[in-house]
């Protein structure tokens, strides 16, 4: 019995810090994401991105911290106006993505993140980068879809791609709308039990649906 208690005592001694670490990381991510939701300009976004950088440095081997550090860089690239700076942000996002992929390449959100980075690259110069990155974008979403076909962000990103593609090249609102509708349905089914699982995109998806109905 004494031996068993010693064993249990050791287990508790080692298990408790692990739990506390996980809670601390989750709480830190949650607080930073709340700040990100209220960002009004590039300066505020840069501050949030710097906080995610610190979290990724503190928990360098965690999928979630590296994921959100990359995600923040992508959002910053959409906000900044200078194209060179956009690419610099995306270069930093790529570095974090490398860690994300190494930690868990079988996570569908890993490949959705890859597609989002590629989408951001295209948005810098759509006319000249569409051919360069379009195939990579589709490949990344295909990987995500094979792992989890019920991820709404897959169809949201497919929809945005078609939305901004001219009709003469096989895009347009009419083709994008069914994808946004599918994403909307899947967003309503998505569980939001933890910040460790990404759940972004629902509000933006609804905005695109409204634009699809505008004449």
Enumerate the language-model features and the residues they cover:
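Bacterial Sec-dependent N-terminal signal peptides
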Residues: 1-29
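Terminal, low-structured helical/coil segments at or just beyond the last alpha-helical repeat
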Residues: 175-178, 182-215
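A contiguous pocket-lining binding segment that forms or flanks enzyme active sites
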Residues: 129-164
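Hydrophobic, well-structured mid-protein blocks that either form specific transmembrane helices
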Residues: 87-139
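Amphipathic alpha-helical repeat scaffolds of TPR domains
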Residues: 24-36, 58-80, 105-125, 151-165, ...
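Helix-turn-helix repeat elements of alpha-solenoid scaffolds
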Residues: 38-52, 85-96, 130-138, 177-184
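Canonical positions in the second alpha-helix
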Residues: 55, 100, 143-144, 183
């Amino acid at each position: 019995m004494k031996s068993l208690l010693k064993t249990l005592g050791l287990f508790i001694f080692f298990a408790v810090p692990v739990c506390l670490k996980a809670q601390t990381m989750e709480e830190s991510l949650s607080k930073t994401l709340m700040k990100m939701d209220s960002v009004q300009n590039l300066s505020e976004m840069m501050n949030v991105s710097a906080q995610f950088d610190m979290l990724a440095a503190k928990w360098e081997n965690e999928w979630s911290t590296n994921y959100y550090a990359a995600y923040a860089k992508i959002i910053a690239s959409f906000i900044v106006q200078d194209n060179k700076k956009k690419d610099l942000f995306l270069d930093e996002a790529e570095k974090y993505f490398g860690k994300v992929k190494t930690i868990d390449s079988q996570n569908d959100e890993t490949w959705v993140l890859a597609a989002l980075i590629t989408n951001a690259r295209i948005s810098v110069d759509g006319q000249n980068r569409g051919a360069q990155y379009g195939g990579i974008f589709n490949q990344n979403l295909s990987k995500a879809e094979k792992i989890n076909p019920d991820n709404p962000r897959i169809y949201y990103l497919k929809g945005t791609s078609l939305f901004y593609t001219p009709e003469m090249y096989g895009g347009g609102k009419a083709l994008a709308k069914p994808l946004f509708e599918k994403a909307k349905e899947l967003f309503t089914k998505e569980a939001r039990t933890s910040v460790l699982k990404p759940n972004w995109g629902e509000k933006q998806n609804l905005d695109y649906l409204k634009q699809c109905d505008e004449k």
